Amino acid sequence: MAQTLQMEIPNFGNSILECLNEQRLQGLYCDVSVVVKGHAFKAHRAVLAASSSYFRDLFNNSRSAVVELPAAVQPQSFQQILSFCYTGRLSMNVGDQFLLMYTAGFLQIQEIMEKGTEFFLKVSSPSCDSQGLHAEEAPSSEPQSPVAQTSGWPACSTPLPLVSRVKTEQQESDSVQCMPVAKRLWDSGQKEAGGGGNGSRKMAKFSTPDLAANRPHQPPPPQQAPVVAAAQPAVAAGAGQPAGGVAAAGGVVSGPSTSERTSPGTSSAYTSDSPGSYHNEEDEEEDGGEEGMDEQYRQICNMYTMYSMMNVGQTAEKVEALPEQVAPESRNRIRVRQDLASLPAELINQIGNRCHPKLYDEGDPSEKLELVTGTNVYITRAQLMNCHVSAGTRHKVLLRRLLASFFDRNTLANSCGTGIRSSTNDPRRKPLDSRVLHAVKYYCQNFAPNFKESEMNAIAADMCTNARRVVRKSWMPKVKVLKAEDDAYTTFISETGKIEPDMMGVEHGFETASHEGEAGPSAEALQ
């Protein structure tokens, strides 16, 4: 038998991508230009299509050398994501990660959405330790300089190992300071929403006044993040565990990492806080890590929602749900539901404290409630209760009911859904209002921890498709009537056309007969 020789070059694919990145930075062999708010970025179609489902679908439908992205995409975020498509590395300022996640979700880059969420949870966690991040779990935050990369071909070599990148990250004083910004939004939202009970006690555990009262003898240096750095030692000391040391230069707390014990999407603060639940202080201290991760997940979702809507620039305008228009046969049943002052007790036993906080108290059914605090998206108490009574514990049904409360049939029929998973290839159809979509998504995330944004994309696209079918069916009787009238008119015209030749034939025969009658006697006379 013939022998087979095999040769393998490690990291050859990475080297090719690095060289392609060098070509991109130098403007060599690029076959597409992506325009973002007037800024043109040259790239290779093959690399963009391999990294992003959005570009893959876009290039399948268009061969244009210039592609323009919507106004919701920011040039800085797209530049970082474009660099990620070539290098697999992300470099961003603290506080920009939420805008980056929004852009990655719009461009449908699953790697950033999956790994980035886990990485940002670790960074935002009070128990975060930069040395505990592994290569397979988190992307690097190493800053890269385009000037250094364009110096020549040697830049295509293997990048620095993760250990050196982590050490560089430790030397930055603001590497874990993204939590206070999200926390201020979260705390202010909870105060405005009137949230109380055990949930407020959990969130107060990580607030700045409580931490200052617990540790007055150890004020943190100005370069450190006081909220993030002091939270985990306080919890660890209360549980009888040694607190981690503080790095002098980086302000990063090293302590027992609890990020591996829980998943950010498997628990909910509302789920654990039933009306009759009781938590003693010892259990709360032991479960401090899990509660902290749960709260961090809520903060990231809230910050992601708020940052996305801030980019649209339309948060100042108030959005309200549509007035209810029900069929006569179901009007009595709906009226009984609208007369409810609060949610039924049996429904509360099933879903717990996962609904809007004002639904648990009696109130006017016509009262307008803000679906999510700070979004300016309002819905009446009766409509929201009808959504919950119809959905029960099924979050997908709740999502459909909420979308139907804000968008009528014609709006859905003339839309392409969320824009991420389009229900039509017609470029004239625009996505639904992003403010309503963000508010509904965040409300469903509070209701069901396992809610996925892809579910909303699919359901919205399905609702738009069904709305177009219903609108098309409603036009069918009118089209049939017009077609019947057109057929009758055509039949009348055809019959009229048949009558006219017959009349012409009769006249022609009469004239011929008269001529023959006149010619007959003259011929006989000649004879």
UniProtKB/Swiss-Prot annotation:
Give the location in the cell. Nucleus; Cytoplasm
Q: Which UniProt keywords apply?
A: Cytoplasm, Disease variant, Epilepsy, Intellectual disability, Isopeptide bond, Nucleus, Phosphoprotein, Repressor, Transcription, Transcription regulation, Ubl conjugation
Tissue-wise expression: Overexpressed in several types of carcinomas including ovarian serous carcinomas. Expression levels positively correlate with tumor recurrence in ovarian serous carcinomas, and intense immunoreactivity in primary ovarian tumors predicts early recurrence. Up-regulated in ovarian carcinomas after chemotherapy, suggesting a role in development of chemotherapy resistance in ovarian cancer.
- Which residue stretches does the UniProt record annotate as biased composition, category Polar residues? 141-152, 255-277
Bias kind Low complexity: ranges:
225-251
* Glycyl lysine isopeptide (Lys-Gly) (interchain with G-Cter in SUMO2) crosslink residues: 167, 183, 318, 452, 480, 483, 498
Question: Which residue numbers mark the cross-link Glycyl lysine isopeptide (Lys-Gly) (interchain with G-Cter in SUMO1) in this sequence?
Answer: 167
* Disease cited in the entry: Neurodevelopmental disorder with epilepsy, cataracts, feeding difficulties, and delayed brain myelination: A neurodevelopmental disorder characterized by microcephaly, profound developmental delay, intellectual disability, cataracts, severe epilepsy including infantile spasms, irritability, failure to thrive, and stereotypic hand movements. Brain imaging reveals delayed myelination and cerebral atrophy.
Q: What does this protein do?
A: Functions as a transcriptional repressor. Seems to function as a transcriptional corepressor in neuronal cells through recruitment of HDAC3 and HDAC4. Contributes to tumor progression, and tumor cell proliferation and survival. This may be mediated at least in part through repressing transcriptional activity of GADD45GIP1. Required for recruiting the proteasome from the nucleus to the cytoplasm and dendritic spines.
Its recorded name reads Nucleus accumbens-associated protein 1
- Per the UniProt record, the source organism is Homo sapiens
